[in-house]
Structure formats: C-alpha cells, structure tokens
Amino acid sequence: TVPIGDYTGTETSATHTPDHLFAPGSYTFAVWNPAEGITVNGTTATIAAATGTRAGTDAFVNNALGWFFTYTEQVTIEKDKDYPLTAAMKQQVRELTLVVEPTGDAAGRITEIVAHLTGAAGTLDFATDTYGAASNVVLPFTKITEGDDAGKWKATVRLLGVTGTEQLLTAEIRYADGNPSPTTLKSDLTEALKEFNTGKGKSLTLGGTLVETPEGMEVDGAEINGWEEVKGDDVNADL
C-alpha cells in the first residue's frame, strides 16, 4: 500500500507509478504491506485483539503477527516535475522465543505452563518509531520432546515491539494429578528485552532455568534464574 497525501495506491510489483497529479507541497511518502493481525491508519500500525480464551480481557493482543514492512519519507513536490523515489523497506515484526528448563523432582510432572508477557507494544507509529498501548500477549508454552532440549518448555511469539517501563512474564505451572498444586511463576524480562525494538531482522531466543520446581504438596512459587540469549538461526522474512 502506497499512501501519499490524499492518494492511496496498491502495488504488487517492484515499482509503482501513481496515476495522480500531486499539487506542489510537502508530503509524507509511506509504503507498507498488509500483514496478518495488523491494521494501519496513516502511519500508525495497530495490533488486533487476541482471540480465544483471552479475547477481550486485560488488553491481550495477537501474538502471531504476519511479517510487516514499512517505509516513510518526507518529500517536497514541485510543479511539472517527476520524482523517482526508492523505498528501502524496514522489518517491523520480530520473533521472540523463550526456552525454560525446569529443575527439581517435580519437573517431569509438569503438564502445562499457562503464561503471558506484559509490556508488548499494541501500536507503532512507524514514521516516528513511537511505540504505544502497552499490552499483554499469551506465551504458548509447549514441551520439547526431541533432541538436545527434550524436557524443556518453549514459547514463540511475533511482536511489533515492547513498550512501557517493564516486561514481565507471569505464569501458572500445572502438574499431573494436581500434585503438587499449581505454582505461580513471575519473571522480569525488562533487561533481557531492552534492545528488542532494534535489529528486528534477527530473531531473539532467551533461555532460563526454572528454580526450584516444588516437591510434594507445598508450593512457594518459582522463578527463572538468569535469562540468557541463545544463539541460533535468524528468523526474518523477505517482502
């Protein structure tokens, strides 16, 4: 989509020639592609609300966005002159993966980790790189059953960015037969995600150890010990 002033065009090839005569003046030249879970008004992208069990609750937004690219430039147009413009598209969605390694005698009894992350950006003005609407996203943890990481739990989401003063992971860890009782997990990811909004062309994987998984029926809660970046293949997209 190519909006310029009161003109909006749609292009599917590498070049776009507007069939439109622009009055002399200053314009914001913007280019962006349609992406799942994202709507655009002017130069502000807004994430759709979450669906499913979290729909309409506590400002939860979509956690599986399509790949979204943008470009903006301020241009001054003079009368009777053609302007060739090149749009170097910028990736605006980044993939985040969290890998958790449970420890303790009850680690093997974990059946489910119900979790969400706070401080995800719900909007982005891509002309000014302004993130807003601090929102929550579901972290869909599943157990890894094969390979070197078997026994760990992993969640992958795609985010427009992070915003606000903090990003907190909150979860309830559930066990087979209700033994032990569910454990509450809270972990601060603010420091680990402080550079998340830069370098979006590279995926980010963070790993941490869950200590200490409770034993028996007594539950005091759990925490993640030392989030660290896990190096792996970059995940990006070509427009």
Residue ranges of model-derived segments:
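Residues within well-ordered beta-strands of beta-sheet-rich folds
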Residues: 30, 97-99
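Ser/Thr- and Asn-enriched, surface-exposed coil loops between beta-strands
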Residues: 10-14, 79-81, 92
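Short, low-complexity, Pro/Ser/Thr/Gly-rich segments in the mature regions of secreted, periplasmic
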Residues: 139-145, 224-239
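Structured interaction patches on ligand/partner-binding surfaces of diverse proteins
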Residues: 37-84, 178-212
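Intrinsically disordered, low-complexity segments enriched in small/polar residues
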Residues: 206-226
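Structural motif
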Residues: 99-108
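Conserved "repeat-terminator" motif of extracellular CCP/Sushi domains
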Residues: 86-93
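Tryptophan-paired
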Residues: 1-45, 109-195
